A protein has these predicted regions:
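Short, conserved phosphate-binding/catalytic loop or strand-edge motifs used
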Residues: 15-23, 36-37, 169-171
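Short, well-structured active-site flanking segments
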Residues: 13-16, 160-162
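A glycine-rich phosphate-binding loop feature that marks nucleotide/adenosyl-phosphate handling sites
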Residues: 38, 59-62, 76-77, 151, ...
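Catalytic phosphate/nucleotide-handling subdomain of diverse soluble enzymes
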Residues: 28, 39, 117-189
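Catalytic cores of secreted or luminal carbohydrate-active enzymes
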Residues: 177-212
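Accessory "access/gating" subregions that flank catalytic or transport cores
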Residues: 2-13, 21-26, 40-138
């Protein structure tokens, strides 16, 4: 659910992170709030640039330098710098040093933050490759692929998402409740309502229209 805050605060990572932390505080604390801030800020930054390292840096700027969320990202980055091709070696490192056995509960955020970092680095700005890596790594596959998919979807725009992903969905969505959507495949509706009527910063990346 945290993706929303990056989407309504384009090109403003700090505001996106602030909204995300406020919302996430209802059900999360600690590292969960850092994860919310990172994801929302990264999505927001993706409206300005498709450079994945800039996007990651913008997200990391919104969380403490000494938190575990930042540390697992740093560990993945070191693996990537050492060998940008061998994502499996990076996954093995995550499983050995940051795996589920190191944290309480059944679905801790830190191992999954590592998977998101892996997908973002090794995916290198390719939408399909990034969500595929997030899924192939296992653990919390739906959230991980969904989070990085939102970042990449904004960064590359509709034209950067292959037809094999867009075509089957087309303009239809199946939900457990009653909802209505129009032109899901191509159209992103932006209004001034989320910003309280204030003009949003220009979102220049991936062909996004800066006008409200």
């Amino acid at each position: 659910f945290i993706d929303t805050w990056g989407l309504i605060a384009p090109a403003d990572p700090a505001r996106a992170a602030r909204y995300a932390v406020t919302a996430a505080s209802v059900s999360h604390d600690g590292e969960g709030l850092h994860g919310a801030a990172f994801m929302a800020a990264a999505i927001s930054k993706a409206f300005e640039t498709s450079d994945m390292e800039e996007i990651i840096a913008a997200g990391l700027q919104q969380i403490p330098a000494d938190c575990l969320y930042r540390k697992v990202f740093d560990a993945v980055e070191r693996c990537y710098r050492n060998d940008p091709q061998d994502w499996r070696a990076c996954l093995a490192m995550l499983q050995a040093e940051w795996g589920y056995d190191k944290y309480p509960g059944v679905c801790h955020i830190i191992p999954n933050a590592g998977v998101c970092a892996l997908a973002l680095y090794y995916g290198r700005g390719d939408f399909a490759r990034t969500i595929e890596l997030a899924s192939m790594c296992g653990w919390d596959t739906d959230c991980n692929a969904g989070n990085v998919g939102t970042i990449l979807g904004v960064a590359v725009g509709p034209q950067g998402i292959d037809e094999c992903y867009r075509g089957p969905i087309n303009d239809e969505i199946v939900l457990s409740g009653i909802s209505g959507y129009s032109q899901l495949q191509q159209k992103a509706v932006r209004t001034g309502l989320p910003s309280g009527g204030r003009e949003m910063p220009g979102a220049s990346g991936a062909g996004w229209d800066a006008a409200l």
